[in-house]
A protein has these predicted regions:
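Short catalytic/metal-binding and nucleic-acid-binding patches
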Residues: 1-160
């Protein structure tokens, strides 16, 4: 079966889920997790996308992202950039990611808040921490500043 064609440009905000190859817990080591965060934040600083929320779990990641390129290119940079560096810098051999990813366009403020809460609560739901702020590989970490909610998603009382 062919992969779905996505023609998404940078005009939307998306909830993303991508899994490791065969759901292996490849991202549970601190070295792999820190490298992933470095790649994720590096491409953000290069203005390839706006990053609103994220969590890196042992076998997958979730993002709330507004691509400034196409969605496909943003995910190619993240997944491909991480794979390249993991193999080069950490000597990893083998497949890291499943080929596809799940995306859902965020339509409104309520969806944005629901996805944000889901991302922040994911480590708690998986019994990795008691509160989201204690999980070191997420945007819930105190003091981490990410990109603001896109204006088009804000309710009118927050837009003013």
């Amino acid at each position: 079966m062919a992969a779905p064609h996505r023609g998404n440009t940078g005009s939307g905000t998306y909830f993303i889920t991508a899994s490791t190859f065969q759901k292996q817990q490849l991202l549970q080591s601190e070295r792999m997790a820190r490298l992933f965060l470095d790649v994720l934040l590096n491409y953000r600083s290069q203005e390839k996308y706006l990053l609103h929320e994220f969590v890196l779990m042992p076998d997958h990641f979730h993002l709330l992202i507004t691509p400034l390129l196409t969605l496909e290119r943003a995910l190619q940079l993240i997944k491909g950039g991480f794979s390249f560096r993991a193999k080069k810098e950490l000597g990893f051999q083998g497949e890291i990611w499943e080929k596809s990813f799940y995306d859902r366009r965020v339509r409104d403020w309520q969806e944005y808040c629901a996805f944000r809460q889901y991302i922040q609560r994911n480590p708690v739901q998986r019994c990795l921490v008691l509160i989201p702020e204690d999980y070191p590989y997420s945007s819930a970490v105190p003091g981490l500043v990410l990109d603001a909610v896109p204006q088009r998603l804000k309710p009118s009382e927050l837009s003013a």
